[in-house]
Amino acid sequence: MGEEKKPNTDDLEKGAGQKVDMKKEILSWVFYIAFVLVLTWVIITFVGQRTRVDGRSMMNTLHDGDNLIVEKLSYRFSDPKRFDIIVFPLTGKKEYYIKRIIGLPGETVQIDENGNIYINGELLEENYGAETIQNPGRAAKPITLGDDEYFVMGDNRNNSKDSRSEEVGNVKRSQIIGRAWLRIWPLNKFGLLKHQ
């Protein structure tokens, strides 16, 4: 009769070793995926996030469909500056607005019947608006900004819902998500955005 085959201890040890290696591999992948998820959350929450321009209110600087990186870090250490392009939500709404800062906290903003912007009674020298402002909205009368308020406008001045309207009004510092920093799409316009 045939010989009874004894299990090879080397084969048993090899199989057990493969199971341990497989567990280590799975555990390694779980930790890696968890790390990537936490890192992604930290970056989106504290550093920057992607956003898409929806509309024509910032033309000719930004165009409908442009994809941007909104940088959130610098405003943790310094205040927004005049002409920064910021992203903020309207109070109580989930949609985000992208506008340029015109008036800073404590300043008085007014737009005259000729479309000129005045800050504290002095003409603002700027060339972001492509055309003469036709409707000064609530800025036809002087608007004095609070200690934490900003007056914002779209670069497409006659096709922008911004601080001139009652719906948007002055933007509080706490509303500002971050500063539009980098255009990543379309690729032929890839680059840093002009703020100053």
Feature-to-residue mapping (PLM):
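Protein maturation boundaries and topogenic segments
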Residues: 1-96, 171-175, 179-196
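Extracellular/periplasmic catalytic domains that process cell-envelope and extracellular macromolecules
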Residues: 61, 79, 102, 110-111, ...
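Structural motif
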Residues: 66, 81-85, 107, 149, ...
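Short, surface-exposed secondary-structure boundary micro-motifs
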Residues: 73, 91, 114, 122, ...
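Mid-length scaffold segments of soluble, non-membrane domains
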Residues: 96-122
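PP2C/PPM family metal-dependent serine/threonine protein phosphatase catalytic domain
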Residues: 119-137
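Soluble extracytoplasmic domains of inner/organellar membrane proteins
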Residues: 138-178, 183-186
